[in-house]
Amino acid sequence: MPKGKKAKGKKVAPAPSVAKKHEAKKVVNPLFEKRPKNFGIGQDIQPKRDLTRFVKWPRYIRLQRQRSILYKRLKVPPAINQFTQALDRQTATQLFKLAHKYRPETKQEKKKRLLARAEQKAAGKGDAPTKRPPVLRAGVNTITSLVENKKAQLVVIAHDVDPIELVIFLPALCRKMGVPYCIVKGKARLGRLVHRKTCTSVAFTQTNPEDKGALAKLVEAIKTNYNDRYEEIRRHWGGGILGPKSTARINKLEKAKAKELATKLG
């Protein structure tokens, strides 16, 4: 073989036509036309998305949402922030169970009682004065005077009073006068106890002898959670939680700073 000439490789014979795979062509129905959607402005109807953020809510809902966001974003002073720490569910259930026994009478019950008493008097059976049963006392002014006179055994305050200024002083007053207090969820729930729509606060003044043990247990648990922790509660600020946009912006700036520092050092 002369130098400089390369030997040519043998060519492989092409595969027979039988061995070739016949790709099945997709049968396209000419009646079905392709109509790609255009989601530009003024074109096709937009796909379903979660547009909750853009809904024009009723005014009262808008205020609720704004208030909750402001409480997260702004720095909330301890006096207001303490109302976010409600009583735990188990203790609250026991408390409401006991409070249910001391609900004040309704207008219908009072009418029925007075009618029975009047009938008794008319029958000539005499009108002996009856002892007032122990019931819950409700309302800020009533409870303030009870606490000041140290007549309240336990004060229950609602966490969602609006405006909060109505009850903001009560925890400090209760602690000063040595009265056990607690914060529970729901002014509406307290309202149901005293036959009203809502109620800012209720207080126990007297209880029946059979319930004194249950009340003493509750008072002990509540004192541990609220009265004894007053100094800790007084120092604890709330809020200051940034939103997702602000957090993302801060993270982006920090990444850029870290990158810049790395290039300077490297």
From Swiss-Prot:
SUPFAM superfamilies: L30e-like. Residues 1-28, 105-134 are annotated as: Disordered. Residues 1-11 have a biased composition (Basic residues). Residues 116-130 have a biased composition (Basic and acidic residues). One of its GO terms (biological process) is ribosome biogenesis. PROSITE patterns: RIBOSOMAL_L7AE (PS01082). Keywords: Cytoplasm, Ribonucleoprotein, Ribosomal protein. It comes from the Eukaryota. GO terms for cellular component: cytoplasm; ribonucleoprotein complex; ribosome. It is found in: Cytoplasm. GO terms for molecular function: RNA binding. Its main location: cytoplasm. Belongs to the eukaryotic ribosomal protein eL8 family. Component of the large ribosomal subunit. The ribosome is a large ribonucleoprotein complex responsible for the synthesis of proteins in the cell. Component of the large ribosomal subunit. This is Large ribosomal subunit protein eL8. It comes from Takifugu rubripes.
